[in-house]
A protein has these predicted regions:
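Condensing-enzyme catalytic core mediating Claisen C-C bond formation in acyl metabolism
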Residues: 1-25
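Structural motif
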Residues: 4-6, 51-53, 85
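N-terminal transmembrane alpha-helices
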Residues: 17-25, 34, 41, 59
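Short, well-ordered amphipathic alpha-helical segments that serve as non-catalytic structural scaffolds
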Residues: 27-43, 68-72
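Short acidic capping loops at alpha-helix termini that bridge into adjacent secondary structure
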Residues: 46-52, 81-82
Length: 91
């Protein structure tokens, strides 16, 4: 393949452990804020110029189910023409 992959930025979201500040916050809400923050941090990157959104999630059930990568990318304002997918990552 001759296509180049460019990672512009990456971030790790906070944990929502029991008793923590984010314990009652849904994973998809945290990820929407995270994606919006990445877009704000990189104003030269237009949402329409993004080729893929990949989200790693430890548990693909509940609020992290139903392809969290796709749903949060849409909620964050990334065009529906941009594929979003989830990576099952037990970290």
């Amino acid at each position: 393949m001759s296509e180049r992959v460019v990672l512009v930025d990456a971030v790790r979201s906070p944990f929502g452990k029991a008793g923590s500040l984010y314990a009652e916050t849904r994973a998809d809400d945290i990820m929407v804020r995270t994606l919006r923050g990445l877009l704000e941090r990189n104003p030269k990157v237009l949402p329409s110029a993004i080729d893929d959104v990949a989200i790693a999630a430890a548990t693909q059930s509940g609020d992290q189910g139903m392809n969290i990568g796709r749903s949060v990318s849409l909620l964050a304002g990334i065009p529906d023409s941009v594929p979003g997918y989830s990576i099952d990552r037990w970290c």
